[in-house]
């Protein structure tokens, strides 16, 4: 079945029950859908963490990623059912005040059905219009800007170098997040973490949250479909009945920051009250590539590109040291879509 999936572009599809209610199945992520129940089992937990499995899966996803750069991969960039410019798809792309597609994103040919994108990858990694997501308060150096169009997943304070991150709950272990680099991890002990989640319809390039200098970049090999098995969806979930076993990957986002394939970008902020910041791009499910586009020693401004995801759902983490007194606006809350380059937080003098 997977052999058939990786020689075709993903379809856009929202799944509904017999009453028309939306089901919690990921759209545009066919392998994730295939593994959705297996992820939430002890056997899946063991299998999907095995290095040999993830090496093989990376090879497969890289092959699919190569196909998604071809002209043939653009054949579902249509307005037909299952197409990424269908009426239902555009409603998703423009939901949560994201804005009209052609006004928000750079389209090579805005009047064409496929908007002029030459491949599915070109469509997925599309650029944002310069005026659609301006950097808010660019001259205020106390501001930390949102590096990815996303939703809040978690804010954690007083983070530890080592912690029991395999337990349920929002527990972070800096040593494991930062690829077991104890020297770097100890610089962030006692600091603050912000983690956000990107929808498949979000903008998937990363921008710098601050003015500063790139100190180090690193690509970390990891898992793609591993999740922490649980008892299913909690009470009060908008799309799932309590106990529905699907969605374990999304519920495991904190844990994935320690184990998933990811990219680390360390930035020394020009503002000493902020200090060293680590941006972590966390690959989830059909993400075969975290591409870093900056190099060590490079100067960046808030809003400068750091890199991008190629295909899939994804997450990101910002890690601040203990010297950074970080506060978040009242409107940064669970469930609210936070726009790229908007004010995510502020740092105050201790």
UniProtKB/Swiss-Prot annotation:
Q: In which pathway does it act?
A: Secondary metabolite biosynthesis
Among the record's GO biological process terms, what is one? phosphatidylethanolamine biosynthetic process
Output the InterPro entries linked to this UniProt entry. Answer: PS_Dcarbxylase, PsiD-like
Q: Keywords in UniProt for this one?
A: Decarboxylase, Lyase
Instruction: Give its E.C. classification number.
Output: 4.1.1.-
Molecular function, one GO term: phosphatidylserine decarboxylase activity
- Give the superkingdom in one word: Eukaryota
Induction of synthesis: Expression is highly induced during artificial growth in symbiosis with Populus, which is close to its natural condition.
Q: Which family does it belong to?
A: Belongs to the phosphatidylserine decarboxylase family.
Q: What does this protein do?
A: Decarboxylase; part of the gene cluster that mediates the biosynthesis of the psychoactive metabolites ibotenic acid and muscimol. The first committed step is glutamate hydroxylation by the 2-oxoglutarate-dependent dioxygenase iboH, and the last step is decarboxylation of ibotenic acid to muscimol by the decarboxylase iboD. The order of the intermediate reactions is somewhat ambiguous. IboA likely activates the carboxylic acid at position 5 to introduce an amide bond, and the flavin monooxygenase iboF generates the N-O bond. There are several options for the latter step.
Q: From the Swiss-Prot or TrEMBL record, give the protein name.
A: Decarboxylase iboD
Q: Which organism is it from?
A: Amanita muscaria (strain Koide BX008)
């Amino acid at each position: 079945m997977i052999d058939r999936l990786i020689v075709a572009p993903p379809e856009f599809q929202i799944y509904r029950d017999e009453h028309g209610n939306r089901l919690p199945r990921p759209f545009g992520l066919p392998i994730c859908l295939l593994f959705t129940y297996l992820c939430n089992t002890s056997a899946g937990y063991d299998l999907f963490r095995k290095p040999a499995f993830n090496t093989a899966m990376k090879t497969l996803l890289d092959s699919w990623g190569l196909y998604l750069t071809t002209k043939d991969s653009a054949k579902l960039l249509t307005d037909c059912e299952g197409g990424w410019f269908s009426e239902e798809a555009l409603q998703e792309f423009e939901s949560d005040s994201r804005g009209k597609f052609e006004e928000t994103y750079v389209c090579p040919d805005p009047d064409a059905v496929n908007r002029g994108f030459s491949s599915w990858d070109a469509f997925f990694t599309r650029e944002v219009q310069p005026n659609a997501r301006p950097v808010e308060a660019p001259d205020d150096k106390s501001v930390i800007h949102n590096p990815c169009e996303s939703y809040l997943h978690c804010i954690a304070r007083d983070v530890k170098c080592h912690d029991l991150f395999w337990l349920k709950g929002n527990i972070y272990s800096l040593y494991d997040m930062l690829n077991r680099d104890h020297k770097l991890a100890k610089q962030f002990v006692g600091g603050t973490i912000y983690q956000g989640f990107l929808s498949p319809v979000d903008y998937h390039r990363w921008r710098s949250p601050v003015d500063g200098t790139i100190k180090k970049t690193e690509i970390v090999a990891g898992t793609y479909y591993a999740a922490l098995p649980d008892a299913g969806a909690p009470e009060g979930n908008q799309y799932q009945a309590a106990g529905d076993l699907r969605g374990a990957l999304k519920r495991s986002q904190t844990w994935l920051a320690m184990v998933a394939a990811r990219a680390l970008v360390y930035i020394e902020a020009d503002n000493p009250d902020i200090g060293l910041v680590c941006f972590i791009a966390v690959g989830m499910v059909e993400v075969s590539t975290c591409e870093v586009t900056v190099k060590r020693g490079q100067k960046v401004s808030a809003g400068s590109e750091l890199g991008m995801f190629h295909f899939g759902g994804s997450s990101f983490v910002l890690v601040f040291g203990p010297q950074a007194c970080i506060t978040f606006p009242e409107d940064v809350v669970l469930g609210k879509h936070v726009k790229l380059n908007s004010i995510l937080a502020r740092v105050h003098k201790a």
